[in-house]
């Protein structure tokens, strides 16, 4: 047997304190204390007794602050000194130990005073004594802790720094919880609480930074270096990082009751080898690679060990691991083979899942050099046996691979409780076994097979059990399903690794997701769920419990980078409602972001009692109300506080418990009412609560049909509007209002915003110099009520708003500023517009328009606001001035063009009438002349806004003046034409038909009568005035041979007719006063227009248009803005008749009160465009 010493036989911290070890019946009982022992005991205490009170204070005294003297504190310093090979100078060492002794003495006085006060809490003297003792303790710690961070000794002093920091945080938590009962005022308590939350982060980041510095310092290339590196990592995890990981639990307002935490990080005992003292050159990287990469936690079920032999020596050559996911919530899985599958002896299966798992290994090492010269100089460094001991309260037999040994894992990872046998007081259990192996070198053969034992803290339970009386923290790495994500190394202060959920890449099927199994012993307890996370951007996350979504909203960014995380880089979000275990036995987080990743640290389940819930709701309501105002005196609202948010805060206050906080509720109610009044005062919109539409459009809302006003529901507290879809884009559903010029300030940016419950194809416009446009699609959230014990209906049928939409991020930009069609992640929308100079005479104002022009479109929106955002400065000011100048230049050009067009149009209109009273048409005025004049009237640009044609434009007055006269002309013309449906626009209505005829619509959009057969006849009886004169005017076209005839006659004689033929020479008929000239001549005279009368222009609601969202583009273009719906206001661009149509007239004087108009032909086809019988003027 080789006498080379085993380096594991003398671990530095054991050598420092030289403890006595007694072996009683195979059990190890420590009678001495090392820094590792003390730290493990403290961690156990913090994990199990983290409740404010005398029990906690006295517990710290019993574990460390009441029993330590100079030698024990010196042991903490020596431990790290030896690990990093750096000795602290005598002055700094003595100063640190003296400070620690002073703190210990002072804390014992503090603890005794606390015990006496807790026994008689109303005693004024004891209350005053506690105030004195707290101030003394806090001052001493504030002064002492910087002395444990002496320059150049930050690493050697790190473990005592953390002990002092832990003490300071516990004292600050005491005053946060008990300060009011001690007699401190609220301001002092709040100030100390702020110190507490600030120092949690400061102490944490300091400890992790110098831990990493020390770890980097001890790294080296060889096996000896790695042993020291691993020892530093393992021991400072136990003495520093584990304690730091529990610092956040000192936040007494976030964790007001007992909190159950779990440490999922793994530590590693050294490779179980003899002669592992540095002869293995350059092996440190290989050893480190043999450790598992970050992973979801699993449960070690069994180890199947294979045996090989070399020259008669049997050894552990390889193994396979069988494991289960946490909670045994899935099938068992097998890891790839570690090492080699030797067959020198039968494989042996070690069952790890007995009792509480394997807590201890006793290994036998083997080192041999069979030959010592030449190429046969061989080294065999292996393990030839191990005993696996189970954690249990009974004497459960150990499992043994080949034989037990003397290399004890408890020498490196001691128990956390030395007052009981190690099988009960153990601190860690075996979680995995990997292997370091090495092959051949240049001059010798080296066989190295070193199993690497990984250990996890016993607080990381097999199942995720949710306590009914404590806040339960479940690390995300205890999940059993991870999709599009990864497990990453923890930063050192989280107690384990983290889960990163990747972005979906805008593919909803690829959203990162982590799922965690949970178990509830109590089925009646209600819980809220809180998640600790880190993100560099505002990110939309969804939390599901079972099949129900309990949280879905955008949470704010917490970090500037996800690399080198600091404690301040993590934030929390929480479900607003409480739920029972009936929702299911899984909880998960899904990343809805298409572009950003998120890191999930842990889930927290907070049990809700009536008192706790009332306190939570009151605190939440107070924070929400105070956050509305710019200052504590409530003089003004924050700009980013929306009207919708105020309503939701009001809901929070409304549903506070009258039983627990009636006075506070009344006070908060007055504050939120004041906030609502301030919101109304700054809102420039009239009737923002939608009391009525179209009552006074000039002073409120105007709108179309298809709009309904609905009362509040579980989303909206006040009235909101619903806009439905439309079957014709020329008749959209719309809602509009004008912001009067008198309400606007010069050179100021204004913002339109509101809340959209859901929408499809909702177009939003702000119009001043141009149209700022946004198309918004907001998917509906469905019911706001996931499966829960609460009902969405109140006892009187009113909506229950106990779960308002308060997950609100004021920093989130909810708008698509470039005018593109987009789906908002948020239901909040905003659109801004800049105002340049103001002119009350011009009264340009700002038009606000909501419009839907598709069949599938719809929208539900409310809490609309138009408010001042900020004065314009710098580039924004220059931009609006430039935009206004361009607008005015084009406006001047438009005025010049309008004067010319108006003059021409007016002349055309005036020519239709006899006089300026416009009450009588000229005798020769025909329908073509009226349409030609109408076309010229419609050539006036900017009569109405293209975005919504019910809104008048700059030329509305002159357009309506002339258009009114056109309507008068049509009316007068109708009055003197006694034939009904003479243009066949209504088919054959009013006409009698014999035989087969058709009414066809030509390509020029004209309806014509087609008589294809000689035996067909179309007629109409017309009443006339005997003795008066009439003009029969017909426009028609003859195809083929024969003649087309339009006859007028009475019962007896008095017959006349107009004949049409496909002839070249002009025909003269008796009494015919007009020759058969080509009709296009008349068209040219009147501009080629022949437009029909249609709906009145007031019925035309809209125009599709494409508008950029910057001022310089498309404000007033030089050409006419295209408007395919313009004919719906009374104008349709009739093209001239094709060549061949002629118009003929004859005079007729009836002798009776009835005449007949008959249309027929002799052969071929006769096409009639119009028939008119006009009463002559007297």
UniProtKB/Swiss-Prot annotation:
<protein>
    <recommendedName>
        <fullName>Pesticidal crystal protein Cry1Ac</fullName>
    </recommendedName>
</protein>
<keyword id="KW-0749">Sporulation</keyword>
<dbReference type="Pfam" id="PF21463">
    <property type="entry name" value="Cry1Ac_dom-VII"/>
</dbReference>
<dbReference type="Pfam" id="PF03945">
    <property type="entry name" value="Endotoxin_N"/>
</dbReference>
<dbReference type="Pfam" id="PF03944">
    <property type="entry name" value="Endotoxin_C"/>
</dbReference>
<keyword id="KW-0800">Toxin</keyword>
<dbReference type="GO" id="GO:0001907">
    <property type="term" value="P:symbiont-mediated killing of host cell"/>
</dbReference>
<dbReference type="InterPro" id="IPR001178">
    <property type="entry name" value="Pest_cryst_dom_II"/>
</dbReference>
<comment type="function">
    <text>Promotes colloidosmotic lysis by binding to the midgut epithelial cells of many lepidopteran larvae.</text>
</comment>
<dbReference type="InterPro" id="IPR005638">
    <property type="entry name" value="Pest_crys_dom-III"/>
</dbReference>
<dbReference type="GO" id="GO:0030435">
    <property type="term" value="P:sporulation resulting in formation of a cellular spore"/>
</dbReference>
<dbReference type="InterPro" id="IPR008979">
    <property type="entry name" value="Galactose-bd-like_sf"/>
</dbReference>
<dbReference type="GO" id="GO:0090729">
    <property type="term" value="F:toxin activity"/>
</dbReference>
<dbReference type="InterPro" id="IPR005639">
    <property type="entry name" value="Pest_crys_dom_I"/>
</dbReference>
<keyword id="KW-0614">Plasmid</keyword>
<keyword id="KW-0308">Genetically modified food</keyword>
<comment type="similarity">
    <text>Belongs to the delta endotoxin family.</text>
</comment>
<dbReference type="InterPro" id="IPR041587">
    <property type="entry name" value="Cry_V"/>
</dbReference>
<dbReference type="Pfam" id="PF17997">
    <property type="entry name" value="Cry1Ac_D5"/>
</dbReference>
<dbReference type="InterPro" id="IPR036399">
    <property type="entry name" value="Pest_cryst_cen_dom_sf"/>
</dbReference>
<dbReference type="GO" id="GO:0005102">
    <property type="term" value="F:signaling receptor binding"/>
</dbReference>
<dbReference type="InterPro" id="IPR038979">
    <property type="entry name" value="Pest_crys"/>
</dbReference>
<dbReference type="Pfam" id="PF00555">
    <property type="entry name" value="Endotoxin_M"/>
</dbReference>
<keyword id="KW-0843">Virulence</keyword>
<dbReference type="InterPro" id="IPR048645">
    <property type="entry name" value="Cry1Ac-like_dom-VII"/>
</dbReference>
<dbReference type="InterPro" id="IPR036716">
    <property type="entry name" value="Pest_crys_N_sf"/>
</dbReference>
């Amino acid at each position: 047997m080789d006498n080379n010493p085993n380096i594991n036989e003398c671990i530095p911290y054991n050598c420092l304190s030289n403890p006595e070890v007694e072996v009683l019946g195979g059990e190890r009982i420590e009678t001495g204390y090392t820094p590792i022992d003390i730290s493990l005991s403290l961690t156990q205490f913090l994990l199990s007794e983290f409740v404010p009170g005398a029990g906690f204070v006295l517990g710290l005294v019993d574990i460390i602050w009441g029993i330590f003297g100079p030698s024990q504190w010196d042991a903490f310093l020596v431990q790290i000194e030896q690990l990093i090979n750096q000795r602290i100078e005598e002055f700094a060492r003595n100063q640190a130990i003296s400070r620690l002794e002073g703190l210990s003495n002072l804390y014992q006085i503090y603890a005794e005073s606390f015990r006496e006060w807790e026994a008689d809490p109303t005693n004024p003297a004891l209350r005053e004594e506690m105030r004195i003792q707290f101030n003394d303790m806090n001052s001493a710690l504030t002064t002492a802790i910087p002395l444990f961070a002496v320059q150049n000794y930050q690493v050697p002093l790190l473990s005592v720094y953390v002990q002092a920091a832990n003490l300071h945080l516990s004292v600050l938590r005491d005053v946060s919880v008990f300060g009011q009962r001690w007699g401190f005022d609220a301001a002092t308590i709040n100030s100390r609480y702020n110190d507490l939350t600030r120092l949690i982060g400061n102490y944490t980041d300091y400890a992790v930074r110098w831990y990493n510095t020390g770890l980097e310092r001890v790294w080296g290339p060889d096996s000896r270096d790695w042993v020291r590196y691993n020892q530093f990592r393992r021991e400072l995890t136990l003495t520093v990082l584990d304690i730091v990981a529990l610092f956040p639990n000192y936040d007494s307002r976030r964790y007001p009751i007992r909190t159950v935490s779990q440490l999922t990080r793994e530590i590693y005992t050294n490779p179980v080898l003899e002669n592992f003292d540095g002869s293995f050159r350059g092996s440190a990287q290989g050893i480190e690679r043999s450790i598992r990469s970050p992973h979801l936690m699993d449960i070690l079920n069994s180890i199947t060990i294979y045996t090989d032999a070399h020259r008669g020596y049997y050894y552990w050559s390889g193994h396979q691991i069988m494991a289960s996911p946490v909670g045994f919530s899935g099938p068992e899985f097998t890891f790839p083979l570690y090492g080699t599958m030797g067959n020198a002896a039968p494989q042996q299966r070690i069952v790890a899942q007995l009792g509480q798992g394997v807590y201890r290994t006793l290994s036998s090492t083997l080192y041999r050099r069979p030959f010592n010269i030449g190429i046969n100089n061989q080294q065999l460094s292996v393990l030839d046996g191990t005993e696996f001991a189970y954690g249990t309260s009974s004497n459960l037999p150990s499992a043994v691979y080949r034989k037990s040994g003397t290399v004890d894992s408890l020498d490196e990872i001691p128990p956390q409780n030395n007052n009981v046998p190690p099988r009960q007081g153990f601190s860690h259990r075996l979680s995995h076994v990997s292997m370091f192996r090495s092959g051949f070198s240049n001059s010798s053969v080296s066989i190295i097979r070193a199993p690497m034992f990984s250990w996890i803290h016993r607080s990381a339970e097999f199942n995720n059990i949710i306590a009914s009386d404590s806040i339960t923290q479940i690390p995300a790495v205890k999940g059993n399903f991870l999709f599009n994500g990864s497990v990453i190394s923890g930063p050192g202060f989280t107690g384990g690794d983290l889960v990163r959920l990747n972005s979906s890449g805008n593919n909803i099927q690829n959203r990162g997701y982590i799922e965690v199994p949970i178990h509830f012993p109590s089925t009646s307890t209600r819980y809220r769920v809180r998640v600790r996370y880190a993100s560099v951007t505002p990110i939309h996350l969804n939390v599901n419990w079972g099949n129900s979504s309990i949280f879905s909203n955008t949470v704010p960014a917490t970090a500037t980078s996800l690399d080198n995380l600091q404690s301040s880089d993590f934030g929390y979000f929480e479900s607003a409602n409480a739920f029972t275990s009936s929702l299911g036995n899984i909880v998960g987080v899904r990343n809805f972001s298409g572009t950003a990743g998120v890191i999930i640290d842990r889930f927290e389940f907070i049990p809700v009692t009536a008192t706790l819930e009332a306190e939570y709701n009151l605190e939440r309501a107070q924070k929400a109300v105070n956050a509305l105002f710019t200052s504590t005196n409530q003089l003004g609202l924050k700009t980013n506080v929306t009207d919708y948010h105020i309503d939701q805060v009001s809901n929070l206050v409304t549903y506070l418990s009258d039983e627990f906080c009636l006075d506070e509720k009344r006070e908060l109610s007055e504050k939120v009412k004041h906030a609502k009044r301030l919101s109304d005062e700054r809102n420039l919109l009239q009737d923002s609560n939608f009391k009525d539409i179209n009552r006074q459009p000039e002073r409120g809302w105007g709108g179309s049909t298809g709009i309904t006003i609905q009362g509040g529901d579980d989303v909206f507290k006040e009235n909101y509007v619903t806009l439905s879809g439309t079957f014709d884009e020329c008749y959209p559903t719309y809602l509009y209002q004008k912001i009067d010029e008198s309400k606007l300030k010069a050179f100021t940016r204004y913002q339109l915003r509101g809340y959209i419950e859901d929408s499809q194809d909702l177009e939003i416009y702000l119009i001043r110099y141009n149209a700022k446009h946004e198309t918004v699609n907001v998917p509906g959230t469905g019911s706001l009520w996931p499966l829960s014990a609460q009902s969405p209906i109140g006892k009187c049928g009113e909506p229950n708003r106990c779960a308002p939409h308060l997950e609100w991020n004021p920093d989130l930009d909810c708008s698509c500023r470039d005018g593109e069609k987009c789906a908002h992640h948020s239901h909040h929308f905003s659109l801004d517009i800049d105002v340049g100079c103001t002119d009350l005479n011009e009264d340009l104002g700002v038009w606000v328009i909501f419009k839907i022009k598709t069949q599938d479109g719809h929208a539900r929106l409310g809490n609309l606001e138009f408010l001042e955002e900020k004065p314009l400065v710098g580039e924004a000011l220059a931009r609006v001035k430039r935009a206004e100048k361009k607008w005015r230049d084009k406006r001047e050009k438009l005025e010049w063009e309008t004067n010319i067009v108006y003059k021409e149009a007016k002349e055309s209109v005036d020519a239709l009438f006899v006089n300026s009273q416009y009450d009588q048409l000229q005798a020769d005025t025909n329908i073509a002349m009226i349409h030609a004049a109408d076309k010229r009237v419609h050539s006036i640009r900017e009569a109405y806004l293209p975005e919504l044609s019910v809104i008048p434009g700059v030329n509305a007055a002159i357009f309506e003046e002339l258009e009114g006269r056109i309507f008068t002309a049509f009316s007068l013309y109708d009055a003197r034409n006694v034939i009904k449906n003479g243009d066949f626009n209504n088919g054959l209505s009013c006409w009698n038909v014999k035989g087969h005829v058709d009414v066809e619509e030509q390509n020029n959009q004209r309806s014509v009568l087609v008589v294809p057969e000689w035996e067909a006849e179309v007629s109409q009886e017309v009443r006339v005035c005997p003795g008066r004169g009439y003009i029969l005017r017909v426009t028609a076209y003859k195809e083929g041979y024969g003649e087309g005839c339009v006859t007028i006659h009475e019962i007896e004689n008095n017959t006349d007719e107009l004949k049409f033929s496909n002839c070249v020479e002009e025909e003269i008929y008796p009494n015919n006063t007009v020759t058969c000239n080509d009709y296009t001549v008349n068209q040219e005279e009147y501009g080629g227009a022949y437009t029909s009368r249609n709906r009145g222009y007031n019925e035309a609601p809209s125009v599709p248009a494409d508008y950029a969202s910057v001022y310089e583009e498309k404000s007033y273009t030089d050409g006419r803005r295209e408007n395919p719906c313009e004919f719906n206001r009374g104008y349709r661009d009739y093209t001239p008749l094709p060549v061949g149509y002629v118009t003929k007239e004859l005079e007729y004087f009836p002798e009776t009160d009835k005449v007949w108009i008959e249309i027929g032909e002799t052969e071929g086809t006769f096409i009639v465009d119009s028939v008119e019988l006009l009463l002559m003027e007297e």
